[in-house]
Amino acid sequence: MAKKANDLTGKEWLQNSFSIWRDLKKTAEEKKMNHPASYPVALCEKLIKTFSRSDCRVLDPFNGIGSTMVAAKNLNCSGLGIDLSTEFCEIANERIDGAPNISVINGDSFKVLKDSNIGEFDICITSPPYWDILNMKRSADGKVSVNYSDEGSDLGNLSDYEYFLTQLKELFSLVYNRLKPDSYCLINVMDIRKKSEFYPLHSDLAYKLREIGFVFDDLIIWDRQSDYNNMRPLGYPYRFRINKVHEYILIMHKK
């Protein structure tokens, strides 16, 4: 008998199959946390429930303040989160509150993922840097830039787009090697505009990961319009520009 893909009911399966997810917002507590680009625990929980099972082992190589690991804890999963920032690792450890089988490593994912002692994983859920966009002032709502770190190994500090993609490919090749067969790597990304240049990060990254061996299985559109309450008419009145209020979840499958 074939193994079930997840523990969802038929009703939950149908609801989660809709290509646009709108019911995922940060809590008031999450909004107060000092991180420039975090995502809600609710998103991670929904992804784990949809693409794995309650006994899974979860990997996040860009762990930040630990939303993925908190979701793993809440669903009685085990997990490993890795992040360069000592400050954010401390916050992540506070959030998981000593949960058994959940580990947070303050270090370089390129190095940690090469260590065979970390074992294998059933699923990866993560959100890599959106290139160096955090270092730029946002034109849509006027928010100032927030530097994630000054680490030379921080991919968010790379200025060349093609090199940035190449480095992401290298990192996710290490992730690929740590995933069990028939598992998913779910990647939260957003497309980028720098003045007149548009960079379709979601598709560029997906095709890089296909070169590794991942199957680009599908994608989810995460509607975040309710999170944006101070938008400006971009380009008005000379050149019409799109205010992006959505992000993507790339569904990459390791056969």
What do these predicted regions represent?
Residues 1-255:
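Class I S-adenosyl-L-methionine-dependent methyltransferase catalytic core
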